[in-house]
A protein has these predicted regions:
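Zn-dependent metallopeptidase/amidohydrolase metal-coordination segment
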Residues: 155-187
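Polyanion-binding loop/helix "lid" in catalytic or ligand-binding cores
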Residues: 87-91, 149-154
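Metabolite-binding pocket within alpha/beta catalytic cores that recognizes anionic/polar moieties
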Residues: 1-88
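His/Asp/Glu-rich mid-to-C-terminal helical/loop segments that flank catalytic regions of hydrolases
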Residues: 178-204
Length: 204
């Protein structure tokens, strides 16, 4: 994100910030696992909010852009261990949300984990700090907003993008459903269809 911003907002010859800044429209397209039984494999999810469990964004001044009420609700409902750092919640670009939304896409609250195994509740040999965390996230509800999916990018993209003045939106093709234990029969097809859907929406 910093590199993309530097391409348009930093004079690379003088290494100084430009006087007139450019705001980018950034759409992330990726894959994710659903946390809810009614969001099936091969469906699409638009992240209205990104929940950062990675602590990365806490290195920046995010108080003015974070959704503190949702953060507090998540901490309380999951009995979050603050030794892991304070979770952060950042909203998506409302402009891009309006351009991409339709009845073909779910909207929701996306968890951003700091790793693939333990941070997402997976166990091989190492025990994890809270074996019940995934179940707690599945049942999280804040004024009707549920946690829909879990991946590793959205929270940071939303936070850095908003701090830098860019419009960001994260979209996911669901290739696994943790609630039902099912998997996509053709994840590449699901991603291709999401790419086509998004490009058509942006072009119109």
């Amino acid at each position: 994100m910093n590199e993309l911003d530097a391409l348009v907002n930093v004079d690379l010859e003088t290494r100084t910030v430009k006087k007139e800044l450019t705001s980018l429209n950034i759409v992330r397209i990726g894959t994710s696992g659903s946390l809810q039984a009614d969001i099936p494999c091969d469906s699409f999810v638009m992240s209205q909010y990104g929940l950062g469990l990675d602590n990365m964004l806490r290195s920046y001044l995010i108080e003015e852009i974070s959704e503190t009420e949702m953060e507090e609700a998540f901490i309380k409902q999951t009995n979050w261990d603050m030794r892991k750092g304070r979770p952060y919640v950042i909203s998506c670009s409302k402009t891009l949300e309006k351009r991409i939304e339709s009845d073909k896409i779910f909207k929701g609250f996306t968890g951003t984990a700091g790793g693939f195994y333990g941070p997402q509740g997976r166990v091989v040999r190492l025990g994890i700090q809270d074996p019940e965390l995934n179940a707690k996230m599945d049942s999280f509800n804040f004024n009707g907003t549920r946690m829909t999916n879990l991946e590793m990018e959205t929270g940071a993209i939303y936070g850095l993008g908003k701090l830098l003045g860019h419009e960001c939106l994260s979209l996911n093709a669901i290739i696994a459903n943790r609630a039902t234990g099912t998997f996509s029969g053709d994840p590449y097809k699901a991603v291709d269809e999401l790419i086509e859907y998004t490009l058509n929406k942006l072009a119109n």
